[in-house]
Amino acid sequence: MIEMARLKEFYKKDVVTMMMKRFNYSSVMEVPRILKITLNMGVGEAVGDKKVMNHAIEDMTLISGQKPVVTKARKSIAGFKIREGWPIGCKVTLRRERMYEFLDRLISITLPRVRDFRGLNPKSFDGTGNYSMGIHEQIVFPEIDYDKTDGIRGLDICITTSAKTNEEAKALLEAFNLPLKDKDRK
């Protein structure tokens, strides 16, 4: 038998009942859930050096556990010295078990390793129940070996939920122990 991800089990047992009581849902299917987590790494330096892109792909593969898709420039921009079709980044979409395992590692291991971390910005919700955040250094992930990296790159993390409002999404992510800052603290 395949073992279920720890956070998925926690969601099914505890989070669903807590959310049903708090928001008075009539059905279990109304309870918001995390649909996907998207990781995006923009690699502007890849324009000058193609090896940088390969290192970014390796890092993203180690962080996410699956091979990323290379994103290409949609149009040429002379100011950035890029042409249409050139690789400028990579992204990964995590769903199901891998998504819950990544979220578990993010909350319990990675975020506590971020330098001067005081919590995530509660204003980063988009109005429709999705949360976006950025990590400035990929080396905070335990999968990345600091001595073997070619440079420090950041990445964006988008958590897409089925919540209709920011309040529901915030309650859902707080139930998963995502460390959001208090509004009164700066």
Swiss-Prot record:
Keyword Lipid metabolism attached: no
GO BP annotation list: translation
Keywords from the named record: Ribonucleoprotein, Ribosomal protein, RNA-binding, rRNA-binding, tRNA-binding
Recorded GO CC terms: ribonucleoprotein complex; ribosome
A single GO molecular function term of this UniProt record: tRNA binding
Family, per entry: Belongs to the universal ribosomal protein uL5 family.
Matches recorded under NCBIfam families: PRK00010.1
Function: This is one of the proteins that bind and probably mediate the attachment of the 5S RNA into the large ribosomal subunit, where it forms part of the central protuberance. In the 70S ribosome it contacts protein S13 of the 30S subunit (bridge B1b), connecting the 2 subunits; this bridge is implicated in subunit movement. Contacts the P site tRNA; the 5S rRNA and some of its associated proteins might help stabilize positioning of ribosome-bound tRNAs.
Subunit structure, as described in the record: Part of the 50S ribosomal subunit; part of the 5S rRNA/L5/L18/L25 subcomplex. Contacts the 5S rRNA and the P site tRNA. Forms a bridge to the 30S subunit in the 70S ribosome.
Record's protein name: Large ribosomal subunit protein uL5
Organism, as annotated: Legionella pneumophila subsp. pneumophila (strain Philadelphia 1 / ATCC 33152 / DSM 7513)
Designated gene of the protein: rplE
